[in-house]
Each structure stands twice: as structure tokens, then as C-alpha cells.
Amino acid sequence: MNIGLIGSGGREHALCEKILESRLVKKIFCFPGNAGTAEIAQNINADISNFKNILKLVRLYNINLVIIGPEEPLVKGLVDYLTKNKIKVFGPNKFASQLEGSKAFMKKLCLKHNIPTAKFKICSNKNQVLNFLNYSFSPYVIKADGLAAGKGVTICKTKKQVLKISQEIFKGKFKSSNKVVLEEFLNGEEASYFLVVDKKNFKFFGSAQDHKRVGEGDVGPNTGGMGAYS
């Protein structure tokens, strides 16, 4: 079968290589792909935010299954759009994508279902931030609510820094965020666990640790990811 792979990062290159191991796969079309995917698949220059054009290309190249890598098209509802048009697609729908697309949504979900999570406060103005700071201790964790290309989390040592960063977010530093989530700081190592789920079943896909700081030795601001191991 023909596979359509949405995305242009290293993640999509890795997915492309793995998908090609299947005997069921005839060809992979990457939208838009990158230099790595160009060596093992066919890159299609396409704007992945243009859902109508993606649908047109999927039909043009007789693609049997679409796999979506990046968070943004998931959060904006590409799965819902393709599914509505009878295209088979792998990825969470718009509602489920809020787990990644909104930290506030995720924290509320944890609270509702008694899932352990750091203490937090969702803030949309300076006064709410100040109120949180009056009852918390350094270091402080501040997170932009929406997608921020992996750069939306900062660990602050001072209240002044928290106020500065929160105001930048309120003023539109990250276009998808107009709220911040303030959290208590938890000391330890971070890890990600991956599962594929449907309405009745789940399958564990393994775990990994992502290293996001820009500098050697885990220093500097966060990035979308400097490397990971599993």
C-alpha cells in the first residue's frame, strides 16, 4: 500500500525508515519531507496547513494510509478532516490532541481523574500570577499553555523572572498561548512512555528520554529537542 507521511523533521525521517521495513508498504510520499526522506521516499512540496490541498494530493497519489508526525496539524484537526473525507489516518483527533496542545487541558484532566501531577495554577493575567507566587517557593516552573515548538517551559529562580516571562506569553510570544500554567518544581529525571490506544485496547510502544536544553550538560533554554535515547 501507499503511505502518506506528514512532516519535515528528523522524526519523520525515522518513521519513514521504520515504515519501509513492512512488506505491506509499496511507497511512501512525504509532505513535505526533508533531505533524509528524499533518499528513501518521494517528497511532495506541500503546505501541511492547507487541508484541502493535502486531501487532493492524497487522492492524486492513491495513498491508502496517512500518518501525521507534527503536533500542529493534529491540534488543528487534520485527522478529523481526512476521516470525514473517508481517508484512513493514524493519529489523535482534534479533541484528543488537546493532551499535547494545551497544558491547561491536560492538568485539568489529571485533576478530574486523580492522575498524579505537580500542583499547579492556570493564569491568564498578572494578578493571578502574583497570587500564585505569594504561596509558592523557588524554583518556579512556568509553561505556555499552547504549542510552543518545545520552547514553552522555563524553570525560574526568581519571582521577577516569572512575571517577565508570563507577561511575554500574555502579549503573544507564542501565538497559540494566552494563558500560562504555573507549577511546583519536581526534582528528578523526565521520561516519556508511548502507547497506541483505541476505544478498548492499548499497546505499549516503549519509552524514551528527550534532552531539550540547548547547551552541553543540560544547560540553557529549551529547544524542540537536542537528542533522545530509548
Model-derived segments and their meaning:
Residues 1-95:
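ATP-binding N-terminal substructure of ATP-dependent carboxylate-amine bond-forming enzymes
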Residues 156-230:
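Internal nucleotide-binding/catalytic subdomain
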Residues 38-41, 55, 98-104, 215-217:
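Short, charged, surface-exposed secondary-structure boundary motifs
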Residues 43-49, 121-125, 156:
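Short acidic-hydrophobic, aromatic-tinged amphipathic segments that line or gate anion-handling sites
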Residues 58-63, 135-136, 175-176:
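Glycine-rich phosphate-binding loop signature in dinucleotide/nucleotide-binding domains
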Residues 5, 30-31, 67-68, 89-92, ...:
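General beta-strand structural signal in soluble alpha/beta enzymes
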Residues 90-152:
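A conserved helix-loop-beta module that forms one wall/lid of the active-site cleft
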